[in-house]
Regions:
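Short solvent-exposed coil/turn linkers within tandem alpha-helical repeat scaffolds
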Residues: 395, 445, 461-462
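Signature of long, low-cysteine stretches enriched in small and polar/charged residues
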Residues: 321, 337-388
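Extracellular LysM carbohydrate-binding repeats and other cell-envelope/extracellular binding modules
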Residues: 449-477
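Primarily a LysM-type cell-wall glycan-binding module
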Residues: 415-446
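Sec-dependent bacterial lipoprotein signal peptides
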Residues: 1-19
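A Zn2+-metalloprotease active-site environment signal
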Residues: 6, 19-292, 296, 301-302, ...
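Surface-exposed amphipathic alpha-helical segments
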Residues: 120, 254, 300-302, 386-426
């Protein structure tokens, strides 16, 4: 037998033996690792996640989510597994599970849920991924196709064959994706009913996420905005939802929702990006890590990170980036700027007259042309770069760009007062009160329409709907 077919046969036979009984379904699944290896993989991935995502700094909320998760996990197919539930300090609407029982839920998703039962539904879905060993299955499938690709590449000398089989492996995993998500939902329904929660909460979460999607579709003019959608429950289609409702009819029992406990736990939850990434209120950004504050043009989208800020014009045609780096105090802003752009020719170079901090600005010859600027403060240089695919768009926005650069300053007491993050406050609706009674723009940081939409989304009342006396309501302060 020729070498390559023989080697492929050996590899395929070895892979074919890699089956294990799925603890959640009782069926044989293709898995190339035992549960001990799966645990080790989860520990390693968990360390990576901890480095990438900050933990939300609220011990009481963390303990509450852990308590709810443990209640559901006790009734899963792997009750002896030590599940660890963690709230991530992220505004995204997402949750995910790692092999071995590590489950993460983003702070942003908690803000839009309306009961403990809905939180339990999200956690039950992720527990289902763990009990069915979906992470181990995906990794095993990827390893299998990778091994076949390496053998084919070895025999043919063509690396593209390996790439093709890797792509095929990826397609296989994506094909299993919908099946795995539905299986996780089916398991979630079982776990919710067994642990005493109302299984209807699973559909309620889907409705919450669908409202988010409808809102984002209506806000297409917002450039660079990403849905940050939940991969799990919302990764569905009508057939999926119909199947869920059919399965739900089997899971009988009243079940609890525990809205009071959830709203009390949620009071004070931060809305928006982590404080360590700067706090944006309307046009005003106060950035603690960078040690500065500045004002952006109305309608611009501002993306703040721990070490940088990028803003986009309303049509997305122009961007303005800001970074900070140490600077030699003996340099002048103009000398620094010239050196920082590698000696390239600067056009219309001048000092920043009227700025709170000493600085300089110029046009950098293209293509594409860019506006560059620098300001000095506390032995640091704050470097701005503005650009656009079309030079005309940048020139049209140049006055706004320069106004933003000139607004850069150290953090004042007023800036510090505005740097407090926006938080959810939970209240009970009184007799005769309506949703509009709770919409107070306050410091004019957002429009009345935007605030109403936000409150509607937070309370699953988008696009229409009103509150009733005695209802819990999330408001923004």
């Amino acid at each position: 037998m020729p070498f390559l077919p023989w080697l492929l046969l050996v590899v395929c036979m070895a892979l074919a033996s890699g089956c294990a009984v799925n603890p959640a379904t009782g069926r044989d699944d293709f898995v190339l690792m035992d549960e001990a290896t799966e645990q080790e993989l989860g520990i390693r991935y968990n360390q990576d996640v901890q480095q990438r995502y900050p933990r939300y700094p609220d011990a009481q909320l963390q303990a509450y989510v852990q308590q709810v998760g443990e209640r559901v996990a006790r009734y899963s197919h792997r009750p002896d597994l030590a599940f660890i539930f963690t709230v991530i300090d992220s505004p995204d609407l997402n949750a995910f599970a790692l092999p071995g029982g590590y489950i993460y839920v983003h702070r942003g998703l908690l803000a839009y849920l309306g009961s403990e039962a809905e939180l339990a539904a999200v956690l039950a879905h992720e527990i289902g991924h763990v009990t069915a060993r979906h992470g181990a299955r995906q990794r095993s499938q990827s390893q299998a196709w990778g091994a076949i690709g390496q053998v084919a590449a070895l025999g043919t000398g063509v690396g593209a064959v390996a790439d093709a089989t890797q792509l095929l492996g990826g397609a296989l995993v994506r094909g299993y994706g919908r099946e795995m998500e539905l299986q996780a939902d089916e398991l979630a329904l079982q776990y919710l009913a067994r642990s005493g929660y109302d299984p209807q909460a699973l559909v309620k979460v889907i409705e919450v996420l669908q409202a988010q999607d409808a809102f984002l579709r209506s806000e297409r003019a917002d450039p660079g905005r990403q849905a940050g959608g939940y991969h799990g429950l919302f990764d569905s289609h009508p057939a999926h939802e119909a199947r869920l409702r059919q399965l739900m009819s089997r899971e009988t029992g009243p079940g609890v929702w525990n809205r009071d406990a959830y709203f009390q736990a949620l009071d004070g939850l931060v809305i928006g990006g982590p404080v360590g990434q700067g706090v944006l209120r309307g046009r005003h950004l106060s950035h603690g890590p960078l040690g500065v504050a500045l004002d952006y043009p109305l309608g611009w989208r501002v993306v703040s990170e721990p070490d940088s800020v990028t803003a986009y014009s309303p049509d997305g045609a122009v961007y303005l980036g800001l970074r900070s780096e140490p600077v030699d105090p003996g340099l002048s802003p103009m000398t620094f700027l010239s050196a920082r752009v590698g000696g390239r020719h600067l056009l219309d170079a001048r000092t920043l007259d009227g700025a709170a901090l000493p600085g300089a600005t110029a046009w950098l010859a293209g293509p594409p042309a860019r506006r560059v600027a620098v300001a000095f403060g506390d032995a640091r240089a704050y470097l701005f770069v503005a650009g656009a695919e079309k030079g005309a768009a940048l020139r049209d926005a140049d006055a706004q760009v320069l106004a933003t650069v000139l607004s850069l300053r150290g953090v004042t007491e007023q800036d510090a007062s505005l740097a407090e993050p926006v938080r959810i406050r939970t209240v009970k609706v009184g007799k005769g009160q309506h949703l509009t009674d709770f919409i107070s723009v306050g410091n004019a940081t957002v429009s009345t329409r935007d605030l109403e939409n936000r409150i509607r989304l937070l309370n699953n009342l988008y696009p229409i709907g009103d509150v009733q006396p005695g209802d819990w309501l999330k408001v923004v302060r």
